[in-house]
């Protein structure tokens, strides 16, 4: 009756060590993502948005020439830059998480492939 179908103690200990290492690396990654500055721009680079690796908005820069374009064009330029920064920030976070977990499929909300 040895084992009772349970993994051996060595395997269990190794699994806990790996989990602790991932947890420590995740904390380090969280800190790295927080201080990252990722730039997104609109098509003509006259609107720029910077976000952290955690998608936290950091700052906005508008080229003075854009200010004479009118409200709708300015809004569209800012929106394009926001989308660009968010896309790069999200893909950076996803890549870093995959590196951290060694490719384990975690199925984190918002991190999966779009349907």
Curated annotation (Swiss-Prot):
Single GO cellular component term: cytosol
Region Disordered, annotated ranges: 89-115
GO function term, MF aspect, one: DNA binding
A Pfam family annotated for this UniProt entry: YbaB_DNA_bd
Annotated keywords: Cytoplasm, DNA-binding
Keyword check for Cytoplasm: yes
Localization per Swiss-Prot or TrEMBL: Cytoplasm, Nucleoid
Function: Binds to DNA and alters its conformation. May be involved in regulation of gene expression, nucleoid organization and DNA protection.
Family, per entry: Belongs to the YbaB/EbfC family.
Record HAMAP family: DNA_YbaB_EbfC
Oligomer and partners: Homodimer.
Designated name of the protein: Nucleoid-associated protein NATL1_00191
Organism: Prochlorococcus marinus (strain NATL1A)
Lineage: Bacteria, Bacillati, Cyanobacteriota, Cyanophyceae, Synechococcales
């Amino acid at each position: 009756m040895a084992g009772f179908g349970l993994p051996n103690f060595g395997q269990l200990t190794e699994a806990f060590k790996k989990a602790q290492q991932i947890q420590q690396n995740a904390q380090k990654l969280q800190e790295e993502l927080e201080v990252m500055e990722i730039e997104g721009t609109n098509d003509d680079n006259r609107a720029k948005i910077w976000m952290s690796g955690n998608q936290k908005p950091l700052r906005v820069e508008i080229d003075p020439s854009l200010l004479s374009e009118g409200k709708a064009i300015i809004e569209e330029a800012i929106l394009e830059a926001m989308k660009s920064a968010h896309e790069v920030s999200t893909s950076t976070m996803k890549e870093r998480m995959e590196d951290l977990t060694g490719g384990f499929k975690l199925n984190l909300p918002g991190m999966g492939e779009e349907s």
